Amino acid sequence: MCATFELTGERKINKQGVRLYRIRATRDIAARGVRAGDLGGWVSSTHMTTGELRIAKDAWVSHEAEIFEDACVTDSARVGGHARVCGHTMISGYARVDGWSRVYGRAHVFETAVVDGNARVGGNARVLGAAHIHDHVQVRGEACVAGEASLYDRVCVGGQARISGSAYLCGRAVIAGNAAIAEDAYFQVFETLETFEDSVELIRTALPNGEYGAQVRIGTWIGDIGSVVDQLFLCWQRHQHARCSQSEWMERALQIRSRC
């Protein structure tokens, strides 16, 4: 396959110490609205170590985006902005990686998925379907985000977790292990409190009737607001060496409950 781009004489050393070259289109790429002669982003070479083209004939890398190591952009995918794609990653299908996002490791972003903002996708994670990953979201490990799922703010998805359907996650939610969130789920950590040695997160969730409910996460425990006092009492029993009395601990529990 003939390359649709060439390396120009413009070069730089990036923050990882890799020499990069700005690219220029050698023919029109209608799928990406690119004209012959247009300047693009930065790559470390025209081909990967496997001998395959780093950028497929209908794909494009634009603006200040960087593609290096054994990363590639195939099919009709696009990488732009100040995005950085490295490792053994693949951006394929009609996927788009933009903003200041990073895709690394052996991650795969494909179909019509979008990764932008300051998002990070790494490890063996997969982002596919029409999923949108924004802001400071992190997807790593063996996690998979698919369907029309949307992740915002500082959500972190790891382990072998799977997010799909029209799920909407925001705030500081952490989804890991073998967790699965699907359909029209709404999950938001809207406040994180510190209660001595235990982190307490207030979580807002969508109820079947369309209204919003609330839950609380204390460590690995998640339960209804009505159980907060009992659960924090168990925390106090577990941490009796903490420099606080039972009454002080329970007073804090009631304060947290009142804020839910």
Spans of features found by a protein language model:
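Terminal amphipathic alpha-helical/low-complexity segments used for targeting or macromolecular assembly
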Residues: M1-D58, E64, H82, Y94, ...
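Structural signal for interior beta-strand "rungs" in well-ordered beta-sheet cores
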Residues: M48-T49, L53-S62, E66-L193
